[in-house]
């Protein structure tokens, strides 16, 4: 080969490597060098307009919705009233101011130390049509308030859908920035990875901060479902205050459709939405072998049908892989318990929060380790999920700024900034993912990548290989892919 041709090939190859690194960063480990201005974690004052109560004291407030069944044809509408419980009823329909359906709900309340909640209402709207805009009204007369939501497309492997991912939000000015940035995105449903109001950070676990947070996020969650994951700040275990029942506020305020997925607890459950099967786990409930959560997950993974919902996504609070000094190794026990299943069932993505920073891993696993093998480091594994920490919502505890000095080989991108992520499922084979920081005032992604679906990527390859190789050889190749 002529010298000039060899050089041309070399420079062409070099150009493509540089291009790939600059576009999707899948070949380059990166600790972001972005220098932030000072963004102190300052709470929004309780009398701010961001927490404003409705003008009519009888009006519902803190309105929020979540998916109400397994397949996205139901919505749970929740709200709070204070002066009068009123009627726990929602009227709804497909035209504004024309409500031809109604649903009756239930009312509850709770006490925590010296705080007594308002009347908390939960109402199930079921038998909805897919891909339809519904308008709904809560309250009567002058106290009534109206909202809307859009149901997801029918379950289908090529159903396109966009999720937002937010964690550790709180109620600071940084929290507001995250929420405003997200609401300008194309997100249709939020996957919330735990730590909601941070009410436990206030004196005596001030319950009014649950109320202010409910009013704060209403601007989004009254119009699109947020899929809830429990975090450590929802535990609120305070025996010094006489409070020994964990998750009291969370369980009373934020229902989940756990019964639809045969779960025994609202803290772990699963849903199907568009082309995704989403599994929600609790980092702060027992999960070792033979516990209810372990048994449930072992069954739920067998029910996943990748022919219908090719994208398998897991939500939890404490990350299984984390190179930040904050909360280092806190997810290790759950990793040991569940990681082999994640690899076996080819989970696509695992989202977590807890660490107040952002980090994305490569596809790696550490399932071959045992005390005598010496294989103690994570290795590339194309059957493994990508692990993403999005604990950078903006809460009052501030950012986790100290990453390990040397970035581990498994870590693809990390940065200590406030922000949120979006995941656009395009079809059964590809999804567009991006993380957006708040701090630079720009609405452009900082970290982005195109994900190939774990199940369909391997099955497409399997079909191709079967044309030229025997079945056993094909399965060996696929397992190593």
Swiss-Prot record:
Keyword Signal among UniProt keywords: yes
Native organism: Allium cepa (Onion)
Taxonomy of the source species: Eukaryota, Viridiplantae, Streptophyta, Embryophyta, Tracheophyta
Molecular function terms from GO: acid phosphatase activity; metal ion binding; phosphoenolpyruvate phosphatase activity; phosphoprotein phosphatase activity
PANTHER family: ACID PHOSPHATASE RELATED, BIFUNCTIONAL PURPLE ACID PHOSPHATASE 26
Entry-listed glycosylation sites: 109, 206, 370, 427
Top class in the EC scheme: hydrolase
Active site, UniProt feature: 327 (proton donor)
Protein name: Phosphoenolpyruvate phosphatase
Biophysicochemical property: pH dependence: Optimum pH is 7.
């Amino acid at each position: 080969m002529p010298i000039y041709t060899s050089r041309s090939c070399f420079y062409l190859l070099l150009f493509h490597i540089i291009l790939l690194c600059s576009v999707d960063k899948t070949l380059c480990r990166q600790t972001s060098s972005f220098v932030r201005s000072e963004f102190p974690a300052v709470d929004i004052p309780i009398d701010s307009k961001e927490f404003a109560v409705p003008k009519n004291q009888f009006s519902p407030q803190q309105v929020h919705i979540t998916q109400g069944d397994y397949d996205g044809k139901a919505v749970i509408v929740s709200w709070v009233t204070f002066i009068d419980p009123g009627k726990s009823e929602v009227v709804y329909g497909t035209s504004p101011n024309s409500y031809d359906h109604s649903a009756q709900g239930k009312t509850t309340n709770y006490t925590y130390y010296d705080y007594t909640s308002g009347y908390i209402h939960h109402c199930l709207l079921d038998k909805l049509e897919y891909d339809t805009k519904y308008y709904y009204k809560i309250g009567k007369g002058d106290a009534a308030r109206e909202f809307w939501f859009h149901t997801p497309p029918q379950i289908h492997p090529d159903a396109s859908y966009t999720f937002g991912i937010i964690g550790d939000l709180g109620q600071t000015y940084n929290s507001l920035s995250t929420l405003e940035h997200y609401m300008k995105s194309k997100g249709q449903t939020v996957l919330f990875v735990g730590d909601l109001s941070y009410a436990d950070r206030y004196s005596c676990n001030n319950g009014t901060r649950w109320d202010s947070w409910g009013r704060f996020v209403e601007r989004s969650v009254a119009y699109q479902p947020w899929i809830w994951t429990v975090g450590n700040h929802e535990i609120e275990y305070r025996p010094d205050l006489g409070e020994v029942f964990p998750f009291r506020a969370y369980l009373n305020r934020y229902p989940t459709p756990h019964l639809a997925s045969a779960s025994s607890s609202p803290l772990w459950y699963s849903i199907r939405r568009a082309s995704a099967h989403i599994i929600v786990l609790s980092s702060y409930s027992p999960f070792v072998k033979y516990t209810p959560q372990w048994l449930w997950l072992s069954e739920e993974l067998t029910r996943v049908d990748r022919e219908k919902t090719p994208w398998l996504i897991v939500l939890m609070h404490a990350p299984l892989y984390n190179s930040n000094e904050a909360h280092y190794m806190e997810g290790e026990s759950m990793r040991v318990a569940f990681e082999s299943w994640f690899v076996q069932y080819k989970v696509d993505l695992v989202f977590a929060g807890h660490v107040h920073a952002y980090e994305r891993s490569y596809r790696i696993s550490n399932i071959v380790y045992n005390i005598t093998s010496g294989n103690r480091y994570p290795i590339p594994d194309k059957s493994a999920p990508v692990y993403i920490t999005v604990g950078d919502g903006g809460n009052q505890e501030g950012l986790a700024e100290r990453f390990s000095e040397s970035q581990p080989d498994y870590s693809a991108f990390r940065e200590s900034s406030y922000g949120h992520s979006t995941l656009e499922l395009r079809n059964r084979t590809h999804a567009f993912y991006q993380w957006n920081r708040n701090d630079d005032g720009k609405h452009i992604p900082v970290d982005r990548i195109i994900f190939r679906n774990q199940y369909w990527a391997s099955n497409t390859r399997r079909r191709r290989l079967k044309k030229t190789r025997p079945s056993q050889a094909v399965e060996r190749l696929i397992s190593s892919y």
